């Protein structure tokens, strides 16, 4: 048995992970999202615009016999293609045509995996994705742009088998004050600014 500890940040004190639930437009589609980084989970817990406190739930995942897709082991283009499957960086017809071709070329079939592991995305990285698809960003510096600052690694629970191997440690429940968000996470990130400035210089 191989166990890893993961955290889920949410405004909800009570959470029941359920197979088939979740938003299609999240980074890796429907699923239950967790991270090994407790600080990242705290950010998730209080990142909504409503001034409410949040919660970090602690889980243990038995990864024995689970098929895990780790995007860190693949080219960053495969990760971008996965994001494009679920989240639109632009609404233009040209972007939709180009992104479809990009997905066909670099995408990975994730349907057979129990868990997807990889970087999380934010607004600055979707800006870069949009510019890359438009051929405004050179491949040689794409990874450098995407490594500006720590994105954080997330796990997305996808299959019924993976859900069955996920157990909450209720004694590990942590309350997160909303003030933490104001002090630590709310300011415009340096990462976002640098990503934007660098892409503008290309």
Listing of model-derived features with the role each one plays in the protein:
Residues 73-171:
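Active-site-proximal loop/hinge segments that shape catalytic or ion-binding/gating pockets
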Residues 191-198:
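Conserved small/polar residues in nucleotide/adenosyl-binding loops
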């Amino acid at each position: 048995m191989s166990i890893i500890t993961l955290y889920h940040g949410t405004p909800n004190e009570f959470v029941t992970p359920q197979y088939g639930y979740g938003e299609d437009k999240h980074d890796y589609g429907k699923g239950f999202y967790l991270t090994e980084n407790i600080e990242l989970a705290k950010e998730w817990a209080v990142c909504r615009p409503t001034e409410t406190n949040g919660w970090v739930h602690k889980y243990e995942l038995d990864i024995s016999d689970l098929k895990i897709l780790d995007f860190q082991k693949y080219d960053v283009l495969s990760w971008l293609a996965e994001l494009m499957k679920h989240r639109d960086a632009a609404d233009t017809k040209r972007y939709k045509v180009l992104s479809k071709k990009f997905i066909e070329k670099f995408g990975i079939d994730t349907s057979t995996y129990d868990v997807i592991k990889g970087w999380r995305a934010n607004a600055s990285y979707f800006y870069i994705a949009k510019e890359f698809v438009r051929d405004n960003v050179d491949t040689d510096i794409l990874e450098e742009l995407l490594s500006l600052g720590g994105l954080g690694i997330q796990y997305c629970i996808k299959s019924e088998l993976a859900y069955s191997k996920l157990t909450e440690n209720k004694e590990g429940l942590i309350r997160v004050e909303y003030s933490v968000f104001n002090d630590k996470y709310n300011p415009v990130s340096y990462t976002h600014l640098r990503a934007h400035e660098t892409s503008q210089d290309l």
